From Swiss-Prot:
Keywords: Electron transport, Membrane, Mitochondrion, NAD, Respiratory chain, Translocase, Transmembrane, Transmembrane helix, Transport, Ubiquinone. Core subunit of the mitochondrial membrane respiratory chain NADH dehydrogenase (Complex I) that is believed to belong to the minimal assembly required for catalysis. Complex I functions in the transfer of electrons from NADH to the respiratory chain. The immediate electron acceptor for the enzyme is believed to be ubiquinone. GO terms for molecular function: NADH dehydrogenase (ubiquinone) activity. It is an enzyme of class 7 (translocase). It holds the Pfam family Oxidored_q3. This is NADH-ubiquinone oxidoreductase chain 6. Belongs to the complex I subunit 6 family. Complex I is composed of at least 49 different subunits. Coiled coil: none annotated. One of its GO terms (cellular component) is mitochondrial membrane. Signal peptide: none annotated.
Amino acid sequence: MILSVLSSLALVSGLMVVRAKNPVHSVLFFILVFCDTSGLLLLLGLDFFAMIFLVVYIGAIAVLFLFVVMMFHIQIAEIHEEVLRYLPVSGIIGLIFWWEMFFILDNESIPLLPTQRNTTSLRYTVYAGKVRSWTNLETLGNLLYTYYFVWFLVSSLILLVAMIGAIVLTMHRTTKVKRQDVFRRNAIDFRRTIMRRTTDPLTIY
């Protein structure tokens, strides 16, 4: 019951993200999609990933989108025109996505896809008593720091390069950018900077 409710809310919220005319409402529905997804992950027993969804996507990205949309005064009429312009392309992409999903999900619950499997030689084995039960965090840490530690280091280096690149771009000096010298600005004597105008408006001392 809870799974059906959360799935339905996620689908409706995802539809309202692209259908809402107000950008702020779209971002709020976007946040609701991630809340429903976190609930689905909790039902699946993936508590760590559910918390990651809440912290990363809602706490950082969605809030950033919300502030950006609220700062930029976007006209609703312009958004409606843009949506109508790209509606055929988005429809084609949606049809391709559903076509791929029907062919990737080789499941017996889909009647259009007949499965050809030999189920007579399958044996059901209960592995719960044979292995030690690990939590999601322990399993992720074991895989991340043993088998995939090289890719973990590579991703860390990529993030480091991106951070250094952002700092270098902000500190790059060009001749076209006008900047103020703070030391010279503070050292100016304001009593000598006041100009005296005579009776002749063209003469300034």
